[in-house]
Amino acid sequence: IAVLRLFGFNVYRSTYKPLLAESVVEFWNRFYYYFKELLVTFFLLPTFAGPGRKLRRWPRLRLFVAVFAAACIGNMYYHLIRLSAPLAQGDVLESILAQRSRLFYCVLLAVGIFVSMLREQRRQGQPAAAGGARRLLRIFGVWTFFATIWIWGVRGGAPFVARTEFFLGLLGLA
């Protein structure tokens, strides 16, 4: 992309206007581009091509397993490694339990990306329905999805149960 731009072509970078993304996958591709590329290279592609071969009869399940490996397991792996002190002391289980909220965030992210990918496939390459109101609704949906799952993704001292009660309170269920 950089070389094309040097030659005068007005090509957008892959991170162009992430807040105007109309799907979860599009936002993930734009906002977390380099992190996403690492997850795709080290988790999604090896899972899809390796163990995923046994799931050829079930393409949706194969895609889900590969997306789950990248967006959940790979993402969680990154966040566990950031807790180097407890891991160095051998407290692996404690490190995982300390990241319960992040694990739930990763599960929701993986499911959201998978559903978004299925919607993109269902459209079969055709553009999304036109209209300013529909476009705004799709953008609002992406923002709402990420704002909602960020309840569990943000770092802080709130335990998993408190975050879940907060979310349920937003819905009037707690």
Model-found features: residue ranges?
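Membrane-embedded transmembrane alpha-helical bundles that form the catalytic cores
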Residues: 1-174
